[in-house]
Amino acid sequence: MRAPSPLLQRLAAMPGMAPGRRRLVVLLSQLGDFDSLEYAQALVQSLPRLEAAGIGLLAIGIGDATGADRFCAYTGFPRELLQVDAEPVLHRQLGLYSGLQAPGGPWSGLLLMCAGIGSPGTLAEVFRGYSGDRRAPARLESPLFAVLGRGYQRPFELATVRLRNMVEVLGRWRTYVPSDAYITQRGGTFLLDADDTLLYSYRDRGILGFSETMERPLAFLDPYLVV
């Protein structure tokens, strides 16, 4: 299956994202969204392996240049690999989930989604952040968590990461989210082969659902990365 035309049109103007190599394109939600921060943090850890495998990377988020600068400074994501759109035009062209559209506006929709309404899997993922997950790698180097063991994601570990992200965003809300109009918009992931064939795609279904395998968000890349 060929990658969607709107996506190919966007990539055509991007240096290093032309056909002839594999490319990973991540459409983030708002830059201040939990999912965007967590996804970027996961990608940063895999940058050397992506480069070794010759896979080009581009992330496209909702926001502005000031927010993108702060987002990259906080997450460590390379600024040159992040584009921002003021409105989710490409998201819509690709048919990505716009989120729950509630009568009270975007904030009402967001709060309902946080409660799991119109956002499947959100509550289970929140719970996983507190309960720990032996299938997931550790996220924090801390004596406090080391008491609970090593080599896996300990109870409250992921919840602590998310709390830190929340504190960062809430302290700079208008930097990360210049407009509240699109706070429910979800993202998606597209992995293209050298000939523009779509190797993998995933469309987010809800909050804290940016991957099919949240315990290892980039597991879909395993067949394509250099060991």
Segments (PLM) and residue ranges:
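Structural microenvironment flanking redox-active thiols in thiol-disulfide oxidoreductases
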Residues: 39-74, 90
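Short acidic-hydrophobic, aromatic-tinged amphipathic segments that line or gate anion-handling sites
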Residues: 6-9, 79-85
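Short acidic, S/G/P-rich loop/turn micro-motifs used as interaction or catalytic elements
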Residues: 31-34, 65, 206
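Thiol/selenol-based redox catalytic cores and closely related redox-interacting motifs
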Residues: 84-206
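Cofactor-binding loop segments of dinucleotide-utilizing enzymes, especially the Rossmann-like FAD-
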Residues: 29, 62, 194
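A short, polar/charged loop-to-alpha-helix boundary motif
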Residues: 207-226
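Short active-site neighborhood of thiol/selenol oxidoreductases, capturing the structured segment around
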Residues: 15-50, 56-57
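A short beta-strand-turn-helix
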Residues: 1-23
